A protein has these predicted regions:
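Non-catalytic, topology-defining segments of multipass membrane proteins
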Residues: 1-206, 251-298
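Catalytic glutamate of the conserved HExxH
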Residues: 57, 210, 214, 246
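Asparagine-centered polar/low-complexity signal
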Residues: 9, 209, 243-244
C-alpha cells in the first residue's frame, strides 16, 4: 500500500469521526433540525443500499441480474458511501470469502495469536479498521474481479470514485442550503448528511467484518467464524445475518427466516416485482435444512 493510499484511508476514517464529535456537541446544544435528520436519513438509505445491494449482493456475489443503468447507479451510490472504489471493494470482499478467517483473509479478527483479551482486542481492531492501513485494496482486481474489469462502465465508475466522494458531500450541503435558505443550513446539512452519514455507515459496515466474526449465533455448517448479530440487522440493511451469508454467499437474501429482517433483500424483491431484477437467487428451505447443524451455537 502506498503512503498516499494509507493517508487517504486515514483521512477517510478520522475526518468523519471528528465531524461526528462536532455533531454531538451541536446536538447537545440543540443546534440540529429535522431538515438535517432528513438529509442524514435519505443519504444513509441511498448509500447504504448502494453498498449492500450494489457493491455486495449484485457486483460481488451476482445474486441477481438487472439493467445496466441500475447496475451503474447502484455502483455510484455505493461509491458515495466512501468505502473505496468499486473494483477494490469487490476484489477485497471476494478474497475475504476465499480465505475466510484463514491466512490470506484481509480482515479476519482471528489471525492474532492467542485467546487472551489483548489478542481478541488486537484482532477486533484489525478487522474493524486496522486492515484499511495494511490490506485494503491489495487484492488483484484482474484476479478477483475480471468480470468488472471487462465492463467499461464499471471501470468509469471506479475511476471517478474521488469525484463521487465530492458529490456525496456537495449534495447534502446543497440540500441543506436550499431547504434552509442559509449557509449555516448548508453547513449542518453537510455535517449530518455528509460526514456523520459516512461515519455511521462506515462503522456499521466495519462491524460486519469485526463483530459478526466474533459474537453471535450460528445455524449452519460453515468453515469460518461468521455469526448472525440480530441487533445490527436493520442498520446494516440485513448484512448482519452474516453467518447466513457465509453459508450461502450467492443468496440475494441474508435473512432466511421470516423474522430475520433484511431491508436489502426487500429492496431486491421490490426491483423484481417491478421487472427491474431477475434471476434472483433464493435458498430453498430444503437446502437450508441439509446444511443446518443439530442446534444453533453462540
Amino acid at each position: 500500500m502506498s503512503r498516499a493510499h494509507m493517508l487517504a484511508n486515514l483521512g477517510g476514517v478520522i475526518v468523519p469521526f471528528l465531524a461526528f464529535l462536532v455533531a454531538v456537541v451541536l446536538l447537545w446544544n440543540t443546534v440540529v433540525g429535522w431538515t438535517d435528520i432528513a438529509i442524514l436519513t435519505v443519504g444513509y438509505l441511498l448509500t447504504g443500499i448502494g453498498i449492500t445491494v450494489g457493491f455486495h449482493r449484485l457486483l460481488t456475489h451476482r445474486s441477481f441480474k438487472t439493467y445496466g443503468g441500475i447496475r451503474y447507479a447502484l455502483a455510484a451510490l455505493g461509491s458515495m458511501a466512501v468505502e473505496g472504489p468499486v473494483l477494490a471493494w469487490v476484489s477485497d470482499h471476494r478474497k475475504h470469502h476465499q480465505f475466510s478467517d484463514r491466512e490470506g483473509d484481509p480482515h479476519s479478527p482471528h489471525l492474532a495469536e492467542g485467546a487472551r483479551p489483548v489478542a481478541v482486542l488486537k484482532g477486533l481492531f484489525h478487522a474493524h479498521v486496522g486492515w484499511l492501513f495494511v490490506e485494503e485494496g491489495r487484492a488483484n482486481s484482474r484476479r478477483y474481479a475480471p468480470d468488472l474489469m471487462a465492463d467499461r462502465g464499471m471501470r468509469i465508475v471506479d475511476r471517478t470514485f474521488p469525484w463521487l466522494v465530492v458529490v456525496s458531500l456537495i449534495v447534502p450541503f446543497g440540500a441543506g442550503y436550499l431547504l434552509s435558505g442559509s449557509l449555516w443550513g448548508g453547513f449542518t446539512g453537510l455535517l449530518w448528511g455528509g460526514f456523520v452519514r459516512i461515519f455511521l455507515l462506515h462503522h456499521v459496515t466495519f462491524s460486519i467484518n469485526s463483530i459478526c466474526h466474533l459474537w453471535g449465533t450460528r445455524r449452519f455448517r460453515c468453515d469460518d467464524e461468521s455469526r448472525n448479530v440480530f441487533w445490527l440487522s436493520i442498520l446494516s440493511f440485513g448484512e448482519a445475518w452474516h453467518h447466513n451469508h457465509h453459508a450461502f454467499p450467492t443468496s440475494a437474501f441474508h435473512g432466511l427466516k421470516r423474522w430475520e429482517v433484511d431491508p436489502g433483500g426487500l429492496f431486491i424483491v421490490t426491483l423484481e416485482r417491478f421487472g427491474l431484477a431477475w434471476n434472483v437467487v433464493r435458498i430453498t428451505p430444503e437446502r437450508q435444512e441439509r446444511k443446518e447443524v443439530a442446534s444453533n451455537t453462540a
